[in-house]
Amino acid sequence: MARREGEVTETLLKKSTENRGEDRDGLGMKEKVWRESKKLWVVAGPAIFTRFSTSGLSLISQAFIGHLGSTELAAYSITLTVLLRFSNGILLGMASALETLCGQAYGAKQYHMLGIYLQRSWIVLTGCTICLMPIYIFAGPILLALGQEERLVRVARIIALWVIGINISFVPSFTCQMFLQAQSKNKIIAYVAAVSLGVHVFLSWLLVVHFDFGIAGAMTSSLVAHWLPNIAQVLFVTCGGCTETWRGFSWLAFKDLWPVFKLSVSSGGMICLELWYNSILILLTGNLKNAEVALNALAICININALEMMVAFGFMAAASVRVSNEIGSGNSNGAKFATMVVVSTSLSIGIIFFFIFLFLRERVSYIFTTSEAVATQVADLSPLLAFSILLNSIQPVLSGVAVGAGWQKYVTVVNLACYYLVGIPSGLFLGYVVGLQVKGVWLGMIFGIFVQTCVLTVMTMRTDWDQQVSSSLKRLNRWVEPESPSRNQTLQNE
């Protein structure tokens, strides 16, 4: 064992030394930025499109269910907002550990380890999904305990049982996305996402409108639309699309599960604290004066912000992939340069959106409402919306850098402190004590994001990238397995 680990270390050090020389290639700054930008957009472009397509699945279901009745629409919205968003955040966060592991292993040219990491992540996330299943099975009592009306709960608990299949679909969906992104092969994800979107529209019309199957028809279409891209991705991975990185099912997937689980939990905590933050914002404004108008205006602003966040999350994925690849390859300067390029690109786009929404003000609200009172409130909130969009062009990207470098544990603490010890108390104070109402609540929570962004910026600027390469090397040295496993370890030959 010691001899094998020594050989692995020697191999990785050799590759690390070779890759450090890549910076001395004689290219000027303009050429380097252009080359890095192309690598960046190979990941970011498909990731952004996939995010929009995935969000489109829920919007399409919501549109067709909305025609069945207001009770059905409210029940569907509650199920997705309260139950699915909760479990989605946990699974997406835990799957992001795969970005760190696969990205660094791919950069180190330990290609065979990507398939093993993928299988380990399948095992960890499947166990997590089973643990989350009771929230859907007992959705009725849970929603009643949260104060929802009984007539809504009767419909919601039926929808919740259908959503179990969607929740399970997140396991292959998130893990295969991370696996393919690490290799910059995520175009296939965008293609199948586009196909599933079209299939969902057709099936929803056929089952809900033409055959009048109601909720059962809408949820059947949603299940098919969620599983179709998963089947395509798994087939692509296992049937020849990733010959270097997929060597077949292996017993090694059951080895070193505890370290993978710990990294997954750290990643889950980091992402969940971010995804649940806006949900808490909605809850905090529910008891304010003129709450209906405030909530409608805030919902419009959050929907606009969420659309822009799709772009930011695309750059977050690109940052994670580029940083992890460069760290894994031993190119510390490359990791630093990739960080600078992705942050600059995302910030430039954020500045454009900042001025667009700052000057559009209430005009954009008429896309969502005809109420003058709501439009006026949106105009009042537009500076906060514009500033949120500007911060969102930086903060998720820095989180992506953290994922690529493997800092999830530290960023979880930062998120907890900035969001829940700074942002929420500030929002409560400004909204309820000072009396700024919804503007005060949002302003306080933006302050939490601002503090978090400042902390992550300082962390990134003070990072010793050579030390990050060394830490990555140690992790690879601990977890890497022989490139040609013996027959008793492999379930499927190459």
From Swiss-Prot:
Biological process terms in GO annotation: xenobiotic detoxification by transmembrane export across the plasma membrane
This protein's GO cellular component annotations are: membrane
Topology in the lipid bilayer: Multi-pass membrane protein
A single Gene Ontology MF term assigned here is: xenobiotic transmembrane transporter activity
InterPro entries according to UniProt: MATE_euk (IPR045069), MATE_fam (IPR002528)
Keywords assigned: Membrane, Transmembrane, Transmembrane helix, Transport
Q: Where are the transmembrane segments?
A: 40-60, 74-94, 123-143, 158-178, 188-208, 223-243, 268-288, 297-317, 340-360, 384-404, 416-436, 441-461
Report the CDD domains cross-referenced here: MATE_eukaryotic (cd13132)
User: Which superkingdom, per the lineage?
Assistant: Eukaryota
Q: Does the keyword rRNA-binding apply?
A: no
Which region ranges are annotated with the description Disordered? 1-25
Cell compartments where the protein resides: Membrane
Q: What is its main location?
A: membrane
Instruction: Indicate yes or no for the key word Nucleotide-binding.
Output: no
UniProt similarity note: Belongs to the multi antimicrobial extrusion (MATE) (TC 2.A.66.1) family.
Protein name per UniProt: Protein DETOXIFICATION 23
Q: Upper taxonomic classification of the species? A: Eukaryota, Viridiplantae, Streptophyta, Embryophyta, Tracheophyta
